Design a protein with these regions (language model features):
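A structural signal for short hydrophobic beta-strand segments in well-ordered beta-sheet cores
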Residues: 29-32, 77-78, 181
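N-terminal helix-turn-helix
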Residues: 1-58, 219-227
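Extended hydrophobic
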Residues: 143, 147-220
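Amphipathic alpha-helical effector-binding/dimerization core
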Residues: 38-135
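Short amphipathic alpha-helical/adjacent loop interface patches that line ligand
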Residues: 10, 21, 43, 64, ...
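Residue-level recognition of specific faces of alpha-helices
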Residues: 23-29, 42, 76, 87, ...
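Cysteine/selenocysteine-centered motifs that mediate thiol-based redox chemistry or coordinate metal-sulfur cofactors
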Residues: 127, 136-138, 215-229
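A short, flexible beta-alpha/helix-coil linker loop
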Residues: 43-46, 137-138, 197-201
């Protein structure tokens, strides 16, 4: 929203609304892009107001539900917050995949997840270096990318291919694929993913059956986001 929007909705004078918005930006709860202000995922630490304001669940949940119904696999959506991803919507399949329980507001390291790699690929190499420095990055399995140079190479492949495939880099037995939905205006990018059991679903099946479905869902989601302006 703009400063004028914030003043109108809150009933504050523009000067007071501006002070509050700039304070939120200083604290990391909001970002400013030209005339526009938007909340950041850090607001999740305070509650679910962030999700309501971004309207991500209302936009994304139907597509995640459709993916899970069509594929029989869990699907999720997340945004980038620093070096983490933050889950903003999920549609769980009956079978549990991960050792940890994930819900809205859960955080995972971006470099070790397909969601994170899909979102990091939307940044420039300099922006990625600024977030990670020289490393090494935390490792979770033998497949985790812990070298920032190798991470940049992976992200270049993600940009080229238009998707991120993660093969047991976060947790053994977990294979997932993600596609990003670019941000629009002050609204930041979001990524969709489908997660599978590596012993049950091969890489070939992920590419042949799952990737086309998630690409279509991401395209539909992008069109829905575009309607919001």
């Amino acid at each position: 929203m703009t400063l004028s929007d914030a003043a109108r909705v809150t009933g504050l004078q523009r000067s007071a609304a501006r002070r509050f918005l700039l304070t939120l930006c200083d604290l990391g709860y909001a970002v400013q892009t030209d005339r526009w202000f938007a909340l950041t995922p850090r607001v999740l630490e305070l509650g679910y107001a962030y999700l309501g304001s971004l309207r991500f669940p209302e936009i994304i949940e139907p597509y995640l539900t459709g993916l899970t119904r069509e594929l029989g696999e869990s699907s999720s959506a997340a945004v980038l917050d620093g070096t983490d991803i933050v889950y903003v919507a999920r549609s769980a399949a009956p079978q549990r995949l991960m050792a940890i329980s994930l819900g809205i507001g859960s955080r995972l390291p971006a470099h070790a997840t397909s969601l994170g790699q899909a979102l990091l690929a939307g940044l420039s190499d300099d922006e990625v270096r600024a977030r990670y420095g020289r490393g090494p990055l935390p490792g979770f399995t033998q497949a985790t990318i812990t070298d920032p140079v190798l991470l940049l190479e992976r992200l270049e492949a993600v940009r080229r291919d238009g998707f991120a495939l993660n093969d047991q880099e976060l947790e053994l037995g977990l294979r997932s694929v993600s596609v990003a939905v670019p941000g629009r205006g002050a609204r930041q990018a979001v990524a969709l993913n489908v997660a599978t059991n590596a012993a049950r679903v091969s890489r070939d099946e992920v590419m042949r059956r799952i990737l086309p479905a998630i690409r279509e869902a991401a395209a539909q989601c992008a069109r829905a986001v575009a309607l919001l302006g």
